[in-house]
Amino acid sequence: MAGLAFFDLDGTLLDNDRDIIPESSLKALELLRRGGWRIVLSTGRDMDTHYSIRYRSIVRPDAVIHQNGGKVTVGDKLLYKHVMDKKLLSEILSFCREKGFCMGSSVGDKDYFINPEKKTAADRAYNRFIERHFVPFEGLLDPDIEVVGLSFAGNIQEEKPQIEKHFPQLELFAFSSNAGADVVERGFSKAEGMKRLCSYYDAEGEQTVAFGDSPNDIALLKAADIGVAMGNADEAVKRAADHVTDDIRHDGIFNACRYLGMI
């Protein structure tokens, strides 16, 4: 029986080291479509930003869970969007500026960051091939700029605890490179995005299968009927999964879909 298949991007569909989505993964996506599955991208990125749109055009998802559930779209339709409170945002940015941390967000074709050189270093550590368009971070406080989530770059072990202690309403999901983290308000997750899409599609009774590799995927893998961890996933993600497949360079997506009888 077909249903909804949820895929993380970085480290799951996208091989960041080579900046490609493996042919076997694209083949699996096409076979899933033919079999009636709805394809959902579920990522910490905003897939509408200048450096992510090209991946969306390659995957051709039916729907996207952006920024860890902060925004949900179906095709060109905006289904849900949470906008951060400007007062909270101002407090976060002031704190990080005083501490010398790198914090910010990408909105559209612009990258608003404190200490942007640290963001560039984090991109390199994560092997992200991104051409950044940095502008002053204060632009995030413009009433016309809607900020859904933030991105942190820096020392996870030392700086992440300081941010979460000062702002208990925030949760930082570390990248697999440990060079940065997605920053979200507690209560938002990819799993919540899944619930919104299942409601939209009236998908009660349909199977949900989720694929991921990083800590921000754990809630999604647990919420799905079947959670699949990539072979290259963090150990905590593997423990949370129902099935662990091969890594991204050894046809992990295709092999899992075949093993589960999805294709």
Tell me the role of every PLM-derived stretch.
Residues 3-18, 221:
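Asp-based phosphoryl-transfer active-site loop
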Residues 91, 95, 99-211, 215-220, ...:
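Conserved acidic, metal-coordinating active-site core of Asp-based
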Residues 20-120:
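Active-site phosphate-binding/coordination module
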Residues 61-67, 82, 127, 172-175, ...:
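Short hydrophobic/aromatic-enriched beta-strand-loop microsegments
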Residues 1-4, 22, 181-263:
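Mg2+-dependent phosphoryl-transfer enzymes with acidic/Ser/Thr/Gly-rich catalytic loops
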Residues 50-54, 163, 237, 253:
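Hydrophobic packing residues within well-ordered alpha-helices of enzyme cores
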Residues 57-60, 68, 166-169, 223-224, ...:
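Short, structured coil segments at secondary-structure junctions
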